[in-house]
Amino acid sequence: AEKYARAAAERRYVEARLAAMEPCEENLLFFEESLSPAALRALAEGGKTRCTGVCAAFCAEDGGYRYVMASETVDLRAAARSINAALSGRGGGASGMIQGSLLASREQIEEYFHGKIG
């Protein structure tokens, strides 16, 4: 029951974060302290409709970040190699969504994506 309560609380949190976001003409970045992989995916998926570039959701983990990135305009499968190379990352996925982990700092990530912070 506790697991379901946490999932429901995360869903409400993600919905509130997305509802508070104004659409933007750039990349959109979310930095979170602790979200499950499913909630991180939901944040990136929901955010991609609010930006013209990439919506990237990051969760702090082991001195780096887990990430999920989603986009309606950028081929992320093609971009994954350069993103991972620039930010000491591992991961990949499909053209519309990639996931993995990075060892970069928040400052390095923000500098790379030049996005609006959600």
Question: What would you call each of these model-derived segments?
Answer:
Residues A1-G118:
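Terminal appendage regions of diverse proteins
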